[in-house]
UniProtKB/Swiss-Prot annotation:
Belongs to the peptidase M1 family. It comes from Lactobacillus delbrueckii subsp. lactis. Substrate binds at residues 120, 252-256. Pfam families: ERAP1_C (PF11838), Peptidase_M1 (PF01433), Peptidase_M1_N (PF17900). Keywords: Aminopeptidase, Cytoplasm, Hydrolase, Metal-binding, Metalloprotease, Protease, Zinc. It is an enzyme of class 3 (hydrolase). The keyword Calcium does not apply. This is Aminopeptidase N. PROSITE patterns: ZINC_PROTEASE (PS00142). Monomer. GO terms for molecular function: alanyl aminopeptidase activity; metalloaminopeptidase activity; peptide binding; zinc ion binding. One of its GO terms (cellular component) is cytoplasm. It catalyses: Release of an N-terminal amino acid, Xaa-|-Yaa- from a peptide, amide or arylamide. Xaa is preferably Ala, but may be most amino acids including Pro (slow action). When a terminal hydrophobic residue is followed by a prolyl residue, the two may be released as an intact Xaa-Pro dipeptide.
Amino acid sequence: MAVKRFYETFHPDHYDLYIDVDRAARSFSGTSTIHGEIQEETVLVHQKYMTISKVTVDGKEVPFTFGDDFEGIKIEAGKTGEAVIAIDYSAPLTDTMMGIYPSYYQVDGVKKELIGTQFETTFAREAFPCVDEPEAKATFSLALKFDEHEGETVLANMPEDRVENGVHYFKETVRMSSYLVAFAFGEMRSLTTHTKSGVLIGVYSTQAHTEKELTFSLDIAKRAIEFYEDFYQTPYPLPQSLQLALPDFSAGAMENWGLVTYREAYLLLDPDNTTLEMKKLVATVVTHELAHQWFGDLVTMEWWDNLWLNESFANMMEYLSVDHLEPNWHIWEMFQTSEAAAALTRDATDGVQSVHVEVNDPAEIDALFDGAIVYAKGSRMLVMVRSLLGDEALRKGLKRYFDKHKFGNAAGDDLWDALSTATDLNIGEIMHTWLDQPGYPVVNAFVEDGHLKLTQKQFFIGEGKEVGRKWEIPLNANFKAPKIMSDVELDLGDYQALRAEAGHALRLNVGNNSHFIVKYDQTLMDDIMKEAKDLDPVSQLQLLQDLRLLAEGKQASYADVVPVLELFKNSESHIVNDALYTTADKLRQFAPAGSEADKNLRALYNDLSKDQVARLGWLPKAGESDEDIQTRPYVLSASLYGRNADSEKQAHEIYVEYADKLAELSADIRPYVLINEVENYGSSELTDKLIGLYQATSDPSFKMDLEAAIVKSKDEGELKKIVSWFKNAEIVKPQDLRGWFSGVLSNPAGEQLAWDWIRDEWAWLEKTVGGDMEFATFITVISRVFKTKERYDEYNAFFTDKESNMLLNREIKMDRKVIANRVDLIASEQADVNAAVAAALQK
């Protein structure tokens, strides 16, 4: 049953917000004065964790009650029509990284804090009483007071208007949703510039960071705003776009209009020592959030079931914009290794959500943020649309969309209607089959009676219920074929004639931009494999990708995949190496640690990587290509897994040389040097040294490298010490806990310790990060590691009674299937796969 929307009772038009924060008392108080139109005499207004002292309607005090089963109050307004509702309240500062909360950091060993906000999805109600629903757009005037110290900076969605009696007044916002309101204050460092159209661009951090760490993202943000204004043909509507890095932040970033907030790792980097991959990551996060300033902020989904409208489009636009800003990066290749891979794996599990999901109960909202579906799959859908339309038609349709819906709300069909005006294709009809249905098809391509035929059927990894789903599939063939496959079966005609006309092996989904995989019969596959080494990198990646997925779904055997790896071991493309080692890594599940199969698999890794390591060496070279720079990490990691003695020796020698200056070690190789040192030369002293550096450094990339190494310890005593840090926020921040937990759990020597910890500390974990939309991914992490019947049974014993939690329900059920499939796959394939690996070593 649908839960009543508060917007049905009251339409806010403008908020006058007064908020007084007392950091010393860990609390705040204020008045939320809401101008709007009362729709029903009993008005519902959201609040959470608040003490409400008084409510007035048009200056007259009225009765109110707290909801028993919802986060809000019922106000007996006694009237309908235009009114002003004023609510006096107080509330605590939280330590959940939601609502208004402190972030903690150190400068020269001195502990400091910065106050910031996070209101998406439903946390504005923790900061001020409001109608906390996306459709309830209004303007906001913020007056902010706090226990201010000299030298502190205050930021909000809009520029500051004036300061009177210690109160900071900010200019009125444009119409926007409550979840986009933001403010922050504390000691900050900043850099600013202006776009060609005059928009103020700023990057802000704590003073733990140097000015040079802000330069890269400032440049990206400036050029991104300029690009979007041109591409959307719609001006950026605010006078400022400020980017703020918060030391504690639950998500990756948040698109608050005019004041975008980020996890430090996704905004700040040292331009003198960072990887190209990290530059790409920061650039795509910044451009993703700035794409939201139009898609999400200017035009907002009516309700959370259209979350994809915000996230999927921003996810596509981050790549489109970075490709324009830095064409030499070939950023669409990163789309193939991250978005495509994530979506195709997740979307093959029965029970997965569709991109567009009906959601009625607000308690279900945070469960919608499935990164592999709403972000990755959704963006693949929009890449399909872009491919069908072309950029000019896309821009024309988007301008129409923004012109019609700016400062308002929209649903998916509004976008399809706008885009369809720019083409003769029925975009909505095509896209509904992808957005409203979970899963995706495998297209079987085969020669029968001399004809090339295609069939489509939903693809599953593990058990799946076939319900006859059908998709409108853009075939993207490299031969004469229909643009769209609408039917379950398709006869394309005489195979030999098609082959002769094409002059090359016949393939589907060229470019890997449509959301399906292909299973070729032996005739077609043999033809493709003859040309495999001459295919472009994306096609080679796709070949490995589809073989891996088919093997996971038991429509092919991993034993047959093993010989294919050899074909690509000397590829100089980093995305092919990504696909190669992603596929090879899947073979690890069949080789128990310390077994003969494990020994053979490591030897195979050494064979696959040794020529590349010899070609590239450990140390980056002046003038080497971006491809070589990005390929080196894959082959070094593979070489170390393969226990190549020369690689282990070189890595140790590099560590010794940089032992007293590890921060200066090239970021391109630093994680592998550190991991090698911990795995092969580990000690309590080394662990203590690395965790000391972890706590002392403010460089997010260096922190990640140190964490990746520390969790690789093979010593049970050291691992127990590491696990003991999980609840110590002075060492492991809650925002980073999942990464630490995942690292120890993925370590065979630490798996039991981490599994015991999460079961023992579940109540604490839920209290600490349970309100985070990414809380469910702790379960995802577990499903990626477990592979035995015993672990499957333990998983069920622990998680079954937690299915009543709406945030966790789908994840628990899906990951149960993921583990069950892995257990079944290992049982049926292990002997054949390990035999194939052994055979590959004899060649």
